[in-house]
Design a protein with these regions (language model features):
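Helix-to-loop junction immediately C-terminal to a conserved catalytic motif
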Residues: 52
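Non-catalytic connector elements of ABC transporters
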Residues: 241, 252-349
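Short beta-strand immediately N-terminal to the Walker A/P-loop
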Residues: 34-35, 85
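Conserved ABC transporter NBD signature motif
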Residues: 60-71
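Conserved coupling/switch loops of ABC nucleotide-binding domains, chiefly the family-specific signature
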Residues: 58-61, 213
Length: 349
């Protein structure tokens, strides 16, 4: 598969400050959606700005379609990169209606062709009924669709999106994220998407790069990022979970406070004579009232179809557990649980 963008050994630092990004290696295939995911201040937006051409890099290179567009000596202007940009705050012109906002970037083409392009984009983002409205008359989701249509208007071959759903109400966010993914796939446009929200990333991305302190911690598909984190930062940042100590009973058997582990799933030589612990996610604990293994409910969060229970086992070990919401247990109640770990995620302490 052709590489649309290749980033090699990229570093970026602002004057008199430590490196914002260091030794970034990343690539994205044509038509792929890549998400840059990490906590606030980790460097993900700086990387997006460097790709767009807004920031000069100190070392390394960015190659697009086989041509270098950034290194420490040259920086192809933003306007020459053929990239569309969707900003966090939408950046719509308040004095222009939807039609005019979308048409803003369509310079030097006949009016008839421009109108046809705007009409096509309005239909694409399902906003034909809003074409004469002004930004203040639109919902957050509608404004985001206008911003997306405007970014797509000049027919870029790559789209950059910076926290595009951060200002969207939660009740419509899931549908909007799904709609945007469907649209990007329909257009087969290569997209790089920045967010701090793992659920957005998992819902929209083909590939995810986890960034922390200016470096890439892990990259891969969402499934592997969740089930096979390469370090404790990724394990902690992605999803919910707790760590429990592992005791090496003998050369082949391993035990945690909840019971014995399947020694066939453990690389014995890698962990011999080491102080190790295992990640236990809520889906590794099954609620079973008939189980002899009991834990006390310390907190609970109602999530509609289910509860997230925060438990304490043996007065010492915190656990998390999902249960259908018709199992409405009280704080302080002792409930039955079972251990059902499908993926062993083990790290040294």
């Amino acid at each position: 598969m052709n590489k649309k963008l290749i980033i090699s050994d990229l570093s970026l630092a602002y004057e008199e400050k430590n490196a914002v990004l260091a030794n970034i290696d990343l690539d994205i295939n044509g038509s792929e959606i890549l998400c840059l995911l990490g906590p606030s201040g980790c460097g993900k937006t700086s990387l997006l700005r460097a790709i767009a051409g807004f920031e000069n890099i100190n070392s390394g290179s960015i190659i697009k379609d086989g041509t270098c567009i950034s290194n420490n000596l040259e920086n192809t202007p933003v306007s020459k990169r053929n990239m569309g940009m969707v900003f966090q705050d939408y950046a719509l012109f308040p004095n222009m209606d939807v039609n005019s906002n979308i048409a803003f970037g369509l310079k030097g083409i006949p009016k008839k062709e421009k109108n046809e392009r705007v009409e096509y984009l309005l239909d694409l983002v399902n906003l034909k009924q809003c074409n004469q409205k002004y930004p203040h008359e639109l919902s957050g989701g509608e404004q985001q669709r206008v911003a997306l249509a405007r970014a797509l208007a000049p027919s870029p071959d790559m789209l950059l999106m910076d926290e595009p759903f951060s200002n969207i109400d939660e009740e419509i966010k899931e549908e909007l994220v799904s709609d945007v993914r469907d649209l990007l796939k329909k257009l087969s446009i290569t997209t790089i998407f920045v967010t701090h929200d793992q659920y957005e990333a998992f819902n929209i991305a083909d590939k995810v790069a986890i960034i922390n302190n200016g470096t890439i911690q892990q990259k891969g598909n969402p499934y592997d990022i969740y089930h096979k984190p390469v370090n404790k930062f990724v394990a902690d940042f992605i999803g919910l979970g707790v760590f429990l100590p592992i005791k090496n009973v003998n050369d082949i058997d391993f035990e945690i406070p909840l019971g014995m582990l399947d020694n066939q799933k453990i690389q014995h030589d890698s962990f011999k004579d080491k102080n190790i612990e295992i990640l236990i996610r809520p889906d590794d604990i099954i609620h079973n009232d008939s189980s002899n293994l009991k834990a006390v409910v310390k907190e609970k969060q109602f999530r509609g179809a289910e509860f997230l229970y925060k438990l304490l086992y043996n007065e010492k070990y915190p656990l998390l557990c999902y249960a259908p919401s018709h199992h409405n247990h009280s704080i302080g109640e002792s409930i039955g649980i079972e251990l059902d770990i499908k993926h062993y995620v083990i790290f040294e302490k």
